[in-house]
């Protein structure tokens, strides 16, 4: 049984952690979806800036092509770094975030994990663009 979202009280149960590694010095993204598209998916995007500062943000997509930053940032960066052209990000999220608008609840149901990456970090003040399908893929889990 999963924890409930009651009157704004959030679960204290976390997905232990997820680590992604990609041969890039740009941004890396994972999306949780019920379809093959990122439309209505729960998306996390991270990168390591030129100064070595790791960034991680919670996003969603209404149209399946562009991303919008969530009003509620529910992913927590554990560690992030670049090493010899590889970006490594480890993060976690509560199983139930109570963000019914944009976060996909983690349940026993099958969902699709969609990944993507870019060769460069997002420009300051700009959102990452999810359009390079040569650097994307997915799998049901």
Regions found by a protein language model. Give the residues of each.
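Extracellular-facing/secreted segment signature in eukaryotic proteins
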Residues: 1-141
């Amino acid at each position: 049984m999963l924890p409930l979202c009651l009157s704004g009280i959030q679960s204290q149960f976390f997905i232990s952690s997820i680590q992604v590694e990609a041969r890039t010095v740009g941004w890396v993204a994972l999306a949780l979806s019920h379809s093959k598209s990122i439309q209505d998916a729960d998306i996390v995007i991270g990168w390591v800036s030129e100064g070595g500062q790791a960034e991680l943000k919670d996003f969603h997509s209404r149209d399946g092509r562009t991303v919008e930053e969530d009003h509620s940032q529910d992913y927590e960066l554990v560690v992030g770094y670049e090493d010899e052209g590889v970006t490594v990000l480890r993060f976690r999220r509560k199983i139930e975030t109570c963000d019914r608008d944009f976060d996909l609840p983690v349940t026993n149901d099958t969902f699709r994990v969609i990944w993507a990456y870019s060769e460069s970090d997002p420009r300051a003040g700009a959102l990452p663009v999810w359009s390079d399908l040569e650097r994307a893929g997915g799998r049901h889990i």
